Amino acid sequence: SIENIKYIFACKDYVRFRMTGEAYAERTDYSGSGLLNLHTGEYDEHILELFGIGALNDALPPLRNATDICGYVSAEAARKTGLKAGTPVAGGMFDINACALSASVAAPEHVCMVAGTWSINEFIRPEPVTDGRVLMNSLFCIPGWYLIEESSATSAGNLAWYLRNLAQKSDDIYTEINKETASISPADSCPIFLPFIMASNVHPNAKGSFIGINAYHTRAHIVRSIYEGIA
């Protein structure tokens, strides 16, 4: 029950809690949850009340920045993990922050594109975009910057669905499907694949589909159409 909730953690913050015994929430991750005021970087009580979870305010851990030291590896965690006791543990960051940082996004003219389960395009700017043109604003791990994200579930999750349900089993499945895809020329007429098997943030009724399948199309054509639909 709600009364038994001690802390509300993001995944990495829970792992850090188990490593250190210290309960903290990290700002970039929590800003992506919609629970923070992006201008103050603190929990927004109005939003919590709007969501009907105002009573959980006390379960939200104190906020820290990505580079803050949030504790040290405990003796118990050291025994279980092999890490050295006393090792400092930083706050960490939102996964898409980590993607942008590792791609050297450090100025507004830099763009990071992620082809994971989701298709994510992101950049940073000194102010959030507030006119509704983008999917999400969150705090960037570099103070004073916001991470601007446009994304949808239209990337490699589609390929994973195909491999899980339709592809022939293989010990090296990705090499096999890459060979199949390469066997079809870009000039060939492939079906059109709409990559909305997990719906779309553009239209709630959008669904995934193959359009234009003919009798001469092979599995290789289908796989290539998935690649092209994602791209």
How should these model regions be labeled?
Residues 1-24, 34-54, 69-231:
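Active-site core segments that coordinate phosphate-bearing ligands/cofactors
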Residues 52-65:
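A conserved helix-loop-beta module that forms one wall/lid of the active-site cleft
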